[in-house]
């Protein structure tokens, strides 16, 4: 089943504990740095397979930025806060600020990759951080099984065009024929 744009959510973290007696919660954040999760409000919190909206009233980094605590609107005591432990925290894509590149890495997952010659190379399944240049893992089913190709994400050298709206990436890359010697 295709999900509509309205159904898309970006998971930023999870509530993983309670803090104090006034309803504050501890957050495991996937953002970098961790406290960047506090830049977004409202949060969508998944409670028993249902997304609920919460405004972030206050928040701060703890232990030198290693953990984050937040006070959410409507959660005013320790017992109520405890009910949210384990719940995912998400935002809607439109809450993200614009980027210089015009896209986020997560938007590349699922994009169809084609070479300048028009060859279908497969779909982006992962972005691998290598230090020098991040790398797209592109996978395609073939007669020989699943073919995985790694393409360095270097704009204008290997990556010629990225269109996240149509989920298309054009690359200057050729698959090597495994039968050639």
From Swiss-Prot:
MF terms in GO: ribosome binding
Subcellular location as annotated: Cytoplasm
A GO biological-process term: ribosomal small subunit biogenesis
Keyword rRNA processing: yes
Keywords: Chaperone, Cytoplasm, Ribosome biogenesis, rRNA processing
Pfam family, one: PRC_RimM
PRC barrel domain boundaries: 100-177
UniProt xrefs under InterPro entries: PRC_barrel-like_sf, PRC_RimM, RimM, RimM_N, RimM_N_sf, Transl_B-barrel_sf
GO cellular component: cytoplasm; ribosome
UniProt domain comment: The PRC barrel domain binds ribosomal protein uS19.
HAMAP family: Ribosome_mat_RimM
Summary of subunit composition and partner proteins: Binds ribosomal protein uS19.
Function: An accessory protein needed during the final step in the assembly of 30S ribosomal subunit, possibly for assembly of the head region. Essential for efficient processing of 16S rRNA. May be needed both before and after RbfA during the maturation of 16S rRNA. It has affinity for free ribosomal 30S subunits but not for 70S ribosomes.
Family the UniProt entry places it in: Belongs to the RimM family.
Name of the protein in question: Ribosome maturation factor RimM
Organism for this UniProt entry: Hydrogenovibrio crunogenus (strain DSM 25203 / XCL-2) (Thiomicrospira crunogena)
Lineage of origin: Bacteria, Pseudomonadati, Pseudomonadota, Gammaproteobacteria, Thiotrichales
């Amino acid at each position: 089943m295709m999900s509509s744009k309205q159904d898309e959510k970006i998971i930023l973290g999870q509530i993983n504990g309670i803090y104090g007696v006034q309803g504050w919660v501890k957050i495991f954040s996937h953002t970098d740095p961790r406290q960047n999760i506090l830049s977004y409000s409202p949060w969508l919190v998944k409670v028993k397979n249902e997304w609920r909206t919460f405004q972030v009233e206050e928040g701060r980094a703890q232990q030198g930025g290693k953990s984050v605590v937040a006070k959410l609107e409507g959660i005013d005591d320790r017992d109520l806060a405890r009910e949210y432990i384990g719940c995912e925290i998400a935002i809607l894509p439109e809450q993200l600020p614009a980027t210089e590149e015009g896209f986020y890495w997560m938007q590349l997952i699922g994009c169809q990759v084609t070479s300048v010659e028009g060859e279908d190379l497969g779909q982006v399944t992962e972005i691998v951080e290598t230090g020098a240049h991040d790398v797209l893992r592109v996978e395609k089913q073939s007669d020989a099984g699943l073919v995985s190709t790694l393409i360095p994400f270097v704009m204008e050298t290997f990556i010629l065009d990225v269109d996240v709206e149509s989920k298309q990436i054009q690359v200057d890359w050729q698959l090597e024929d495994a039968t050639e010697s």
